Amino acid sequence: MQVEILATGDELLTGQVVDTNSPWLMDRLWDLGLMVRRKTLVADDRDDLRAAILETTGRADLVVMSGGMGPTEDDLTSECVAAVLGVPLERHEPSIELLRERFRKFGRTLTPNNEKQAWFPRGAEVIPNRWGSAPGFTVQVGRGRVVCLPGVPVEYRGLCDEWVLPHVRARLGEVPAAGLVKLFAVPESHADHAMRPVMDDAANAGVRFGYRAHWPEVHVKWTVPGPDAAARAARIRERVLGIFGEQVFGEGKDELPDLVVARLAARGERVALGESCTGGMVAELLTSVAGASAVLDLGVVAYANAAKEQVLGVPAALLAAHGAVSEPVARALAEGARRTAGAAWGVGITGIAGPSGGTPEKPVGTVHLAVAGPSGTEAVARAYRGDRDRVRRQAAYEALNLLRLALR
C-alpha cells in the first residue's frame, strides 16, 4: 500500500505552527510495516490544493489529509475535494444536529459559518469527531482514497486511532511484528554502526530498520513481515539488547521519567533533588508522571551560593575552594538534598548553561552531576553542546538516567 500525507494551512508554511501530526502518523504507520512515501505541505489556496489532491491521489493508494476542515473562509478542504471530483457539496444533517447540540452545551447558537463544517462532497463517508466540532470524511479520488481530517492534534490523532489505522490494518490483513528500543546518549551513527551485523543478517528477509534521533535519546526500530514475524522480531530484540546493554533505557512507549518513578515506587524509596543550572527541570520531568508524589520528597533550586549553603548545607569553604560548578559541589548538593529530606536518594546538578559565564577552564556546557544513595555518591562531568535550553535539557535527562542506573 502506497501512503502519502497532505497537510494544508498557511500557518504551516510561515513557521507559525509546526506540523506534529505527520511525524506522529508516520510513526504509527511504520509499526504496520508502511513507510510514508511523500509528505506535501500546501497553503490555503484553491488552485494549489486542487492540484495537490489530484497529484497525491494519482500516486498513492491512501492520502491522509489534515487541515482546512473548520468554519472560516480559508478552510477549503471539502470544497477543493468536491471540485476535483466534479460533484457538489451536500449538507449532512446528522453532523448539523451534533453541531447544534455541541453549541447548546456551551450556551452558544450555531452560526452559518459553523454549519460549513457539516457540508461534504457528494458520495463521501463522514467520520464523526467526538474530540471536536469538525467531522472528517473519506472518498475515493481516482486510484487513491483520501481521508480528510481536522488539523487540531488531539482531534487528528483521535480520528487516526479510531478510524484511519483500523482501516489500514484491515486492508493490510497480516500486520508485521515490530520492535523499538530506546538508547540514552548513543550517537545515531554509532548505533547504526553497531547494528550493522543485525541488519546484514536480516537484509534478505524483508526486515526494515529505522532510527529516530531526539537527543539525548536515539530510538532503534524494526518491522518484520511473514508468518513467523513475532519469533524473528523477538530474536532481533535479544541481539539489540545484547549489543547496547545498559545504554537501553526502555522499549516501546517507555519514557525515562516514567521508568525512574516506577523503579523508585517498586523499591518503596524516595528521591530529593538539589538543582542549580537546570532550574527545577528534573523536578518538572518527574512530576509530569502520575504517581510522582509517592517517590519525590523535595526539589530545591539552589541557584545562588548562599542558597546552596543555607538550604542544602553545602560548605562555604567547598564553594570557595572549587567553585560552584565542580564535582565536589555536585556531590554536596546531592548529599544535602538527601539529608535534608531524609530520602533514600539525592540528585545534585551544577553547571554553566550559557550563553555567558564560561571560562577556558570551565567553558559553557560544563555540567557536574551526582547521585547520592545508600551505598555512597557517584558523580560524572559532562561537556554539553548547544544553546542554553539544550544544555539544561540534556543535563536534566542525564540526571534521570544516572538515577535509573543507580536503581538497577
UniProtKB/Swiss-Prot annotation:
Family, as annotated: Belongs to the CinA family.
Name listed for the protein in its UniProt record: CinA-like protein
Species in which this protein is naturally found: Anaeromyxobacter dehalogenans (strain 2CP-C)
Taxonomic path: Bacteria, Pseudomonadati, Myxococcota, Myxococcia, Myxococcales
